[in-house]
Amino acid sequence: MGKVIIINGSPRAPRSNSKEYGEIFSSYYKGQADTFNITKKNHKEICSKIEDYTDILLVFPLYADGLPVTVLNFLKVLEENPPKNKPKVSVIINCGFIEPEQNNVCIDMVKLFCKQNTYEFNSVLSIGGGEAILGTPFKIFVKWKIKN
């Protein structure tokens, strides 16, 4: 089992659904997983820690059919401050739309970042109805998908 750095890119990080999705992942992951919330001032700090991990898990909501500005700004700093050993990148993205396909353009943006910066893109979990699903009986399906 590798070490995973979970990076919460939600603008509402401390009280976000993205935080809860990251916590669900951590509860099932058998290796070491550490979580960091992106803020306006900690981009370089997070970038300096990334080389200690085998995997990055970006967790964030869809914003206006794209990445939240918090994630965009972080990726710019990461591009300028790459780690020596580049971990694999995975994504958990959620949107308020029922259809998870609404996330596809955003996922392609992360894949493009990975391709341009020689990170291996590993896996993605695209969640529709992300704002509401955690408060419903359907939460079990999300937990099952994250676990597997």
Q: Which residue stretches match the model-derived regions?
A:
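Glycine-rich phosphate/pyrophosphate-binding loop and the adjoining helix
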Residues: 1, 127-148
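N-terminal beta1-alpha1-beta2 submodule of the flavodoxin-like/Rossmannoid cofactor-binding fold
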Residues: 1-85, 115-116
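Structural beta-sheet core signal
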Residues: 6, 58, 89-93, 123
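Short, histidine-centered active-site or binding-site loop motifs used for metal coordination
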Residues: 8-10, 93-96, 128
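Generic structural signal for well-ordered, non-membrane alpha-helical segments
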Residues: 14, 18, 22, 103, ...
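Well-ordered, non-membrane alpha-helical segments in soluble/globular domains
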Residues: 71, 104-108, 145-148
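Ser/Thr/Gly-rich flexible loops in soluble cytosolic domains mediating phosphotransfer, phosphorylation
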Residues: 84-105
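A hydrophobic alpha-helix/topogenic segment detector
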Residues: 98-137
